[in-house]
Amino acid sequence: MSGKYFEATDQNFQAEILNSDKVALVDFWAAWCGPCMMLGPVIEELAGDYEGKAIIAKLNVDENPNTAGQYGIRSIPTMLIIKGGKVVDQMVGALPKNMIAKKLDEHIG
């Protein structure tokens, strides 16, 4: 099931991701990154699957360099799982949906 992910920015990251009471999966990506484009549909599917249970977000590193820099993002795509305002897990690369979901499930509930 496809859903709408949250578009995270330098401006809304604190309020919408860090201050949320839900677990968040944030995909750090760029338009010029081939593996990022491959991961896009997976993120949309996860947004539908986890609607109401977790925040599924994407953050464009070119448009939002402050947040990407703050988290030391060097390779993209990088996905961070954030819970209670802290990074609790990290994944790098265009991973399959089931691997991402398994990691996310470990931090929900």
Curated annotation (Swiss-Prot):
Residues 2-109 form the Thioredoxin domain. GO terms for molecular function: protein-disulfide reductase activity. PROSITE patterns: THIOREDOXIN_1, THIOREDOXIN_2. Signal peptide: none annotated. Keywords: Disulfide bond, Electron transport, Redox-active center, Transport. Participates in various redox reactions through the reversible oxidation of its active center dithiol to a disulfide and catalyzes dithiol-disulfide exchange reactions. This is Thioredoxin 2.
